[in-house]
Amino acid sequence: MRFSLSLIGLVASGSLAAAHPSHCGAEPSEDFDILSKDITDKLAAEASEIHAPIEVTTFFHVVASSKSVADGYISDKMLQDQLAVMNKAYAPHGFSFKHGNTTRTINPTWATGGDELNMKYALHMGKYADLNLYFVKKLADNSHGSCPYPSNPYPGTPGYIKDGCTILSSTVPGGSQSNANRGLTTVHEIGHYMGLYHTFQGGCSTELGDRVADTPAQKNGTVGCPSSRDSCPDQAGLDPIHNYMDTSDDVCRTEFTPKQAMRMQEMYKEFRAGK
């Protein structure tokens, strides 16, 4: 969405659009808006550039209620296919994901959204530059996935340990989730890990939006896969229903925009690289 903003207006507004309730539980905080303001301003001034390719070490954590796929115990093949989907989506934008390790845990409480912090304290691997993906049978908010936005936490603190995405296991390739079993929930949540908002952040507002200049304004998340949609008719452009950061069906989502790619590169460089 094209935008203009000031730090004062940004904080005072408190306008943080809620995600489509059945898809994504990630919610940006005002602190994240403030932390990322310099990058937002840099991109608005078109002063950014694509950096050298970034390889992200990725740790898979399968957390299930039993050793049944129905209870979240997805196979190594499904994880390999998920990694392939991630790399296909992000490779054109300067990112690749390298498998670091896989853990498997049977814990009915953790597998159904309970005691998340202790789960992550027990399972978290690597550094802040790395990516931890937790595949569970059910999330506490019944969404398909959730992922904290980047910040500047101290190692070992809850904010550091909670970093990483929690994903509904049935959304991986070959999973059972209707219209969302091609692995794009994970692609979407990694977008938040990289600092992207939803494309419908801020709704039809011309002041806020998703802080990316080449995604048209969008009132709310897309349901299904319409042939076309224009939820902000007074703003230029049609809804970006094919964008990975919308909430369309998996079959509908195929792209990031160039400005989204630039934002991810800048955000990773600022908040994660070397940390």
UniProtKB/Swiss-Prot annotation:
Molecular function per GO: metal ion binding; metallopeptidase activity
Record keywords: Disulfide bond, Glycoprotein, Hydrolase, Metal-binding, Metalloprotease, Protease, Secreted, Signal, Virulence, Zinc
Gene Ontology process terms (BP): proteolysis
Disulfide-bonded cysteines: C225-C252
Glycosylation sites (chain numbering): N101, N220
Active site positions, chain numbering: E189
Pfam families, A to Z: Peptidase_M43 (PF05572)
Regions that span the bilayer: none
CDD domains: ZnMc_pappalysin_like
Gene3D superfamilies: Collagenase (Catalytic Domain) (3.40.390.10)
EC annotation from Swiss-Prot or TrEMBL: 3.4.24.-
InterPro entries: MetalloPept_cat_dom_sf, Peptidase_M43
Subcellular location, record wording: Secreted
Signal peptide: 1-19
Amino-acid positions noted as binding Zn(2+) in the UniProt annotation, renumbered to this chain: H188, H192
Any one Gene Ontology cellular component term annotated for this protein: extracellular region
SUPFAM superfamilies in UniProt: Metalloproteases ('zincins'), catalytic domain
Superkingdom to which the source organism belongs: Eukaryota
Assigned protein family: Belongs to the peptidase M43B family.
Role noted for this protein: Secreted metalloproteinase that allows assimilation of proteinaceous substrates. Plays a pivotal role as a pathogenicity determinant during infections and contributes to the ability of the pathogen to persist within the mammalian host.
Protein's name according to its UniProt entry: Extracellular metalloprotease MGYG_03559
